[in-house]
From Swiss-Prot:
Listed EC numbers: 1.-.-.-
Keyword Flavoprotein attributed: yes
Entry function: FAD-dependent monooxygenase; part of the gene cluster that mediates the biosynthesis of monodictyphenone, a prenyl xanthone derivative. The pathway begins with the synthesis of atrochrysone thioester by the polyketide synthase (PKS) mdpG. The atrochrysone carboxyl ACP thioesterase mdpF then breaks the thioester bond and releases the atrochrysone carboxylic acid from mdpG. The atrochrysone carboxylic acid is then converted to atrochrysone which is further transformed into emodin anthrone.
GO biological process, one term: monodictyphenone biosynthetic process
Annotated source species: Emericella nidulans (strain FGSC A4 / ATCC 38163 / CBS 112.46 / NRRL 194 / M139) (Aspergillus nidulans)
Name of the protein in its database record: FAD-dependent monooxygenase mdpD
Cofactor: FAD
Region (Disordered): 1-48
Active site: R244, Y271
Keywords: FAD, Flavoprotein, Monooxygenase, Oxidoreductase
Amino acid sequence: MTHFPVNIASDKQEFDPERWAKTPTTESSVNGENGTAPTSGLPSRHPSTGISVLIVGAGMGGLMTALECWRKGHDVAGILERSEGPVYSGDIIVMQPSAVSIIRHWPDMLHDMKAEQVHAVVSYETHDGRHIYGPTVPSFNDPEHLETRKGPFVAPAQVRRKFYRMLLRQVARCGLRVEYGKTVKSYFEDEKDGKGGVIIATTGEAEVRVADIVVAADGLKSPSEILIAGQHVPPRSSGLSIYRTAFPKDLAMQNELVRKRWSDSPPIWEYWLGPGMYLGVFVGDDIISFGFTPRDDIVEGTATESWEPDTDPETVAQAMLSGAGDWDPAVLALIRSAPKGAIVHWPLLWRDLRREWTSPAGRVVQVGDSAHSFIPTSGNGGSQALEDAITLATCLQLAGSSQRAYLGTKIYNLLRYERVSCAQKMSFVNSQLKTGTDWDAIWKDPAKIRTRFPKWIFQHDPEAYAYEKFGEAFAHLLDGREFVNTNYPPGHEFRAWTVEEVWRNIADGKRVEDLLDGDWS
């Protein structure tokens, strides 16, 4: 079997800060005015807080935490990553404006993102080729939402590899180094000394690292859960899984049916909706990506939470045909054009959200998937991880000193928990929209098929919100004064919920969207 090269650790020295101290703005040889090299610019740093921050995990949430902590005046004591080098897993991602508005402060990343994001249109089809709606744009780019937006224009799609490399370049330009091959096996804190720490797995004597604040950005099943919650949160099956991949467009265009449908197409993101399943197809200038989401009773075999690309394209095609025998032939041809060794089969597992994301003394704090997992089809996991990073760095800045840094983590947790809980519930809304489609309603008003991107999510500014609410949150934690978050749906009366509760409603034939109180639009 010929394997497509994905999920392989790349050169760990490529982003050494010494290589990026005086480089052009982008990877490409873009010229500045009159043929000169463009200048590279770092944002102004806020005054030093004296707070040392150790970050575990060099995914997008961890890297953005490092960048924003650097900008806010904290001392980034290290970025530890268990992989042996950068790993470019994943394919096409959605980044919502709330997460990337902060890039307006970063000139290099602003330039890179504008140059590299994909201006695709979005279209919706039935599995057998009947057109439903589109071409259109994500609702966050409807004209009425663009006039007052801060930060860069946000295209419908980001190529994950390019977005991730943009963050790695910026980290290097700030003089920060990712330490690869560092597997953290446990977290601890010392309340008396006001420190958090980690123990790194080694073949010899254990390596210990400490800082005022330790940020666990190491994803699902982070060892930090043991310190914070006492145990790992068990996952629950959603009854769905996803096959996903990305590969060079040229490979797919060797097939006549694929060429006939997509060879002259501008960049497009299509959703093909079938009975109890759907397929997302992204066709860009140089890559093709797809994600097929069936019910578990349609497929054979068991998916595992691993980005190991070990699924044969024909397995995906047969799973599609077992659920519906009349798929559009061009779609099946596209699936079969994927190279072997490039497709991941990932279970869509849910984990009930924990209220606490910090250790008892507040010296260890979680961001991203380690705090709150989102299923890969949510279109919101990366955005919420970046919102976490921005909020945490700002709260630490407002805490003001290493002695009070623990208050910053506690306030960050208070500001984020309810918002993330509501954002997770939107994942159910969008999943049900595509796998349990109300066709009578859709054919009467096809625009209702659009993926839901709520205003309360994409119009949020996490940095401004932290500045606005820090004082109230501080008073709440110290004196018990009333505190109300305003970063979730207007009019919604927040209450905690469980995955089991939502699935019980779905099993009873209820639509999650119909059960929401307040304005979730």
